From Swiss-Prot:
Residues 50-57, 124-136, 221-240, 296-314 are cytoplasmic. It comes from Mus musculus (Mouse). It is found in: Cell membrane. InterPro entries: GPCR_Rhodpsn (IPR000276), GPCR_Rhodpsn_7TM (IPR017452), Olfact_rcpt (IPR000725). Disulfide bonds join 100-192. Glycans are attached at residue 8. Belongs to the G-protein coupled receptor 1 family. Its main location: membrane. This is Olfactory receptor 5P76. It is a multi-pass membrane protein. The gene is Or5p76.
Amino acid sequence: MAFLEDGNHTAVTGFILLGLTDDPVLRVVLFVIILCIYLVTVSGNLSTILLIRVSSQLHHPMYFFLSHLASADIGYSSSVTPNMLVNFLVERNTISYLGCGIQLGSAVFFGTVECFLLAAMAYDRFIAICSPLLYSNKMSTQVCVQLLVGSYIGGFLNASSFTLSFFSLVFCGPNRVNHFFCDFAPLVKLSCSDVSVPAVVPSFTAGSIIIVTIFVIAVSYIYILITILKMRSTEGRQKAFSTCTSHLTAVTLFYGTITFIYVMPKSSYSTDQNKVVSVFYMVVVPMLNPLIYSLRNKEIKGALKRQLAKNTFS
C-alpha cells in the first residue's frame, strides 16, 4: 500500500523510485556496470582498511583517518547502491516511508563524515609539512580520536537535520520520486505541506559543513604551498608534494561533485544531470578513493608489496 486514508486526506506510506532509466536494455547494462563498481568499492576499501591495520608502517594519523575514510566510503555507497541495483531488476521499485527516511539519513551521515575526514586529513598534512617538529604533539592519538569523534558527531547532527525535516513533511499526493534514491530535494517537491522551514534547515546545516570543511582544506593547503615554495631542496619539495597529491585528488573529486549538487543554482542543471552527478559522487568516487591512494602513495604501495611478499613466502 502506497497510500493510507487518514481523516480528510490521504497519507503516503511509501514511495516509487523512478531510477535512472526506463530503457530495459540500458537497465541491464547499468546493472552490470554498477554491480562491478560496487564490488570493487567494497573489496578495495576493505583491503585498504585491512592493510592499514596489519602494516605497522602505516600506523600514523594520516592512515588512521584514511582507514575511517574507507569505512565511510563503504557505508556511503552501500546506503544507495543495493537499492539502485534492485531498481534495475524490477519494473517498479518501491520503498517504505520509514525506509526512505533511513536511506536519506544514512547517505547524509556517511557523506558528512567523509567531508570532516577529508578536512582532518588536510589539517594532518598541514601540521606534518608546516610544523614537523610539533607533529607528534599536535597529532597525538588523543587529538586524532577527538577529530574522528567530531566527524561522526557532525555526521549524526547533519543526518538528524535531514531526517527530522523529512519526517516533518506531509505527503498526500504523488509518491513517485524522480531519482534512484530518497534524495531530499525531490522529496520536498512531493510534499503537500509548508516546506519553508523543513527545506531551509538541512540546506543551512549542509551548506555550513561544506563551507567550513572547504575553508579548513583551502587554508591548510595555502600554508602547505607557501611552506613548500620556501624549501630549498628540490627533493624535499617533491616529497612534500607527493604526500598531498592523493588527498588533493580525492578532495577535488568529492567536493567538485557535491558543490555541483548542493551549491549551484537548481535552475542551472536538469534532474537527469543531477542523477548522473549523484551516481558519480555516491557510487564512482567511493570506488576511486582506494585506487587513488594505492596508486599515488609510496607508503601504501610499499606496505602492499611487503604484505604480498610475506603471504607469498609464508
